[in-house]
Curated annotation (Swiss-Prot):
Catalytic activity: L-threonylcarbamoyladenylate + adenosine(37) in tRNA = N(6)-L-threonylcarbamoyladenosine(37) in tRNA + AMP + H(+)
Keywords: Acyltransferase, Cytoplasm, Iron, Metal-binding, Transferase, tRNA processing
Name of the encoding gene: tsaD
Single GO cellular component term: cytoplasm
Subcellular location, record wording: Cytoplasm
Name of the protein this chain belongs to: tRNA N6-adenosine threonylcarbamoyltransferase
Gene3D superfamilies according to UniProt: 3.30.420.40
Organism: Azoarcus sp. (strain BH72)
Record-stated family: Belongs to the KAE1 / TsaD family.
Highest taxon above the source species: Bacteria
Pfam families in the cross-refs: TsaD
MF terms (GO), sorted A to Z: iron ion binding; N(6)-L-threonylcarbamoyladenine synthase activity
Length: 343
């Protein structure tokens, strides 16, 4: 069962083929729109949609060339149906449904966050259900209890800014370019944490929710003060990163203790953050917990995770008739996702 995956939820265009019969990713191609949006300091939805339209046929041709496969080899198409930018989602969904109709194969709308959540299972030493998942990206910060494919319970989430969003906004406050998160992390690596006393929002709230807007405001107050020196930006970046990482780690480990589980899956763009991985690994090792991540290349948005999620759903009994019905949900809570086989 070879599944073609298509990802266009924001500013990355991704295509991939996963073969469920041999449980192997056969190939994936990805195009980032960073250069396209850099001049604007953020993603411009209209430009993102147009670029997806241009790139999808080219990437698919490249993917078929690299894998030696063709349209006739594809058994199903999985595409990101939400959440994300409406126009960007529609480009991928339309392309996927048209391909599926022409090839006479089923098309499966996939939840973007489910793709991230399941991506660590692509590893050779994949975690087994059940586990706790920490989803950390530009748009979402959530802790989930994962009992199986499509069986998700929300334990806690950000009440305002997501962790990745806080990274991006703080990067702008420090005068860094786009994309802000990776640039802030790079700057933090040059600094020394401990100079600035920044808050750890909701660290002791007794639940699994997050809040990062107050931390961002603390940085704004610091850089707006009369005694601020730009030469201290690296130290401030390091302290900001430490504050976010400390809260993420504390909540994630508390969720493991609360559920009685011993495996944590970390997914989403912020999951590639080196300091987060370092601290989580150290803390988890002391408690004999296991922490699993996707490989760094699969932390950002990509088609591989969508193809894989589609393959798992088909394996679990999900069936979709090939039809030119484009289904997208720009706002789509993960807990509203049906388990495979549900009507």
């Amino acid at each position: 069962m070879k599944v073609l995956g298509i990802e266009t939820s924001c500013d990355e265009t991704g295509v991939a083929i996963y073969d469920g019969s041999v449980r192997r990713l056969l190939g994936h191609c990805l195009h980032s729109q960073i250069d396209l949006h850099a001049a604007y300091g953020g993603v411009v939805p209209e430009l993102a949609s147009r670029d997806h339209i241009r790139r999808l046929p080219l990437l698919l041709k490249q993917l078929f060339g690299e894998t030696g496969l063709s349209r006739r080899d594809i058994d199903a198409v999985a595409y990101t149906a939400g959440p994300g930018l409406a126009g960007a989602l529609l480009t991928g969904a339309s392309f996927a449904e048209a391909f599926a109709l022409a090839a006479g194969v089923p098309a499966l709308p996939i939840h973007h966050l489910e793709g991230h959540l399941l991506s660590p299972l692509l590893a050779d030493d994949a975690p087994r259900f059940p586990f706790v998942a920490l989803l950390v990206s530009g748009g979402h910060t959530q802790l989930m209890h994962v009992a199986g494919v499509g069986r998700y319970e929300l334990l806690g989430e950000s009440l305002d800014d997501a962790a990745g969003e806080a990274f991006d906004k703080t990067a702008k406050l420090l005068g860094l370019g786009y994309p802000g998160g990776p640039q802030l992390s790079a700057l933090a690596a040059q600094g020394c944490a401990g100079r600035f006393k920044l808050p750890r929002p909701m660290l002791h709230s007794g639940d699994f929710d997050f809040s990062f807007s107050g931390l961002k405001t603390a940085v704004l107050n610091r850089v707006s003060s009369d005694d601020w020196e730009p030469g201290l930006a690296a130290d401030l970046a390091a302290d900001f990163q430490e504050a976010v990482v400390e809260v993420l780690c504390a909540k994630a480990l508390a969720a493991l203790k609360h559920t009685g589980l011993d495996t944590l899956v970390v997914a989403g763009g912020v999951g590639a953050n080196r300091r987060l991985r370092e601290r989580l690994d150290n803390l988890a090792a002391r408690r004999r917990y296991r922490v699993c991540y996707p490989e760094p290349a699969l932390c950002t948005d990509n088609g591989a995770m969508i193809a894989f999620a589609g393959a798992l759903r088909l394996e679990a009994g999900e069936r979709r008739a090939a039809a030119p019905a484009v289904r997208v949900r720009p706002r789509w809570p993960l807990v509203e996702l049906d388990a495979p086989g549900c009507p």
